């Protein structure tokens, strides 16, 4: 895949992930699959905060899709913060048997998001 194709698919991925983060995280945490997307003990304030942060990131990823190469730092931040967040949660879920469902829920979702963006982001900035 050449860089032009990567950027086109990257724009599509940013739109899809942006919409998912904006409208999908809160319902997954609260109604659709809390076992795989929420953590115990349930803390409403924390859940609202994390859903708000991801909804905001979703808006900015969606906007970045217009011209992904102008938003490399946002995309790189999304990649690395998702890897770090996913790794921490994976370690916690591995240690805490009550959180094992997260190993097939939010943890792989973060790693998948990071992987897709990493694969599609051209390695060097266009000049």
Language-model features and meaning:
Residues 19-27, 44-66, 77-87:
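Core segments of alpha-helical transmembrane spans in multipass integral membrane proteins
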Residues 50, 99-113:
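Individual transmembrane alpha-helices with interfacial aromatic-anchor signatures
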């Amino acid at each position: 895949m050449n860089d032009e194709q990567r950027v086109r698919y990257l724009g599509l991925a940013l739109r899809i992930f942006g919409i998912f983060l904006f409208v999908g995280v809160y319902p997954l945490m609260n109604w659709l699959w809390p076992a795989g997307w929420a953590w115990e003990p349930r803390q409403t304030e924390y859940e609202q905060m994390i859903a708000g942060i991801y909804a905001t990131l979703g808006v900015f990823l969606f906007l970045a899709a217009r011209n992904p190469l102008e938003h490399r730092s946002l995309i790189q931040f999304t990649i690395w913060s998702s890897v770090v967040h996913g790794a921490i949660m994976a370690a916690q879920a591995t240690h805490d048997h009550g959180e094992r469902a997260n190993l097939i829920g939010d943890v792989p979702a973060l790693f998948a998001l990071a992987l897709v963006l990493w694969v599609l982001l051209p390695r060097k900035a266009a000049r």
